[in-house]
């Protein structure tokens, strides 16, 4: 009886584990976001060759966040991280107008992958503190997000260095993932 009660208690009140894959073009701010969420501070980063993985606790959820390098030569490796991914965070440098189409192409490729068909999508529209940054509406349009009919998605304005918008994005992820797992 005690064991059954314990399982029931942890099911409703215990921590849930969620696997999150964070990708985007190189220099979009993925690693800065990961460590801002994990440590609450800005860390000096270098281009990620391979991946960083950290557990971020938020609202009774342990998010295991895989931050995978975004350079074009290593993007084919992204697929090795798709399995069991429940949430996808796609980070966009909203100040990089030259590569927004490239970002759209990479996102579209990923969303067509069968292994990610059930993953929810959170887009971090990063570097919103820069004066020439594209607005959330413009990035939404350029990524064709409104065409996503069969996927839950959300776009959040962020600034990785100040932390603005990061927890609002995690809030959406936690609410969406916990409501869909019931």
Swiss-Prot record:
Q: Which GO terms describe its molecular function?
A: GTP binding; GTPase activity
Reported EC number(s) for this entry are 3.6.5.2
Keyword list (alphabetical) reads: ER-Golgi transport, Golgi apparatus, GTP-binding, Hydrolase, Lipoprotein, Myristate, Nucleotide-binding, Protein transport, Transport
Pfam families tied to this protein: Arf
Q: What does this protein do?
A: GTP-binding protein involved in protein trafficking; may modulate vesicle budding and uncoating within the Golgi apparatus.
List the catalysed reactions. Answer: GTP + H2O = GDP + phosphate + H(+)
Positions with an attached lipid (N-myristoyl glycine) read 2
Q: Which CDD domains match?
A: Arf1_5_like
The entry's protein name is: ADP-ribosylation factor 1
**Family that this chain belongs to:** Belongs to the small GTPase superfamily. Arf family.
Protein's cellular compartments: Golgi apparatus
Q: Which NCBIfam families match?
A: small_GTP
Gene behind the chain:
arfA
Q: Which GO terms describe its cellular component?
A: cytoplasm; cytosol; Golgi apparatus; pathogen-containing vacuole; perinuclear region of cytoplasm; phagocytic vesicle; plasma membrane
Q: Name one GO biological process term.
A: regulation of filopodium assembly
Q: Does the keyword Hydrolase apply?
A: yes
- Broad class of the protein's primary localization: Golgi
Query: Residues that bind GTP, according to the entry?
Result: 24-31, 67-71, 126-129
């Amino acid at each position: 009886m005690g064991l059954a009660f314990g399982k029931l208690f942890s099911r409703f009140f215990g921590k849930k584990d969620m696997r999150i894959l964070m990708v985007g073009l190189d220099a979009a701010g993925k690693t800065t976001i990961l460590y801002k969420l994990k440590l609450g501070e800005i860390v000096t980063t270098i281009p990620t060759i391979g991946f960083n993985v950290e557990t971020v606790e938020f609202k009774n959820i342990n998010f295991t966040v895989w931050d995978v390098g975004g350079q074009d030569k290593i993007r084919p490796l992204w697929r090795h991280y798709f399995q069991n991914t429940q949430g996808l965070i796609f980070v966009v440098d909203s100040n990089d107008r030259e590569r927004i189409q490239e970002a759209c192409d990479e996102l579209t490729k990923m969303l067509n992958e069968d292994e990610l068909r059930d993953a929810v999508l959170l887009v971090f529209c990063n570097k919103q503190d820069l004066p020439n940054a594209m607005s959330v509406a413009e990035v939404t349009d350029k990524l064709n997000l409104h065409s996503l009919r069969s996927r839950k998605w959300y776009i959040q304005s962020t600034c990785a260095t100040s932390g603005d918008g990061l927890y609002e994005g995690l809030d959406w992820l936690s609410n969406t993932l916990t409501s869909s797992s019931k």
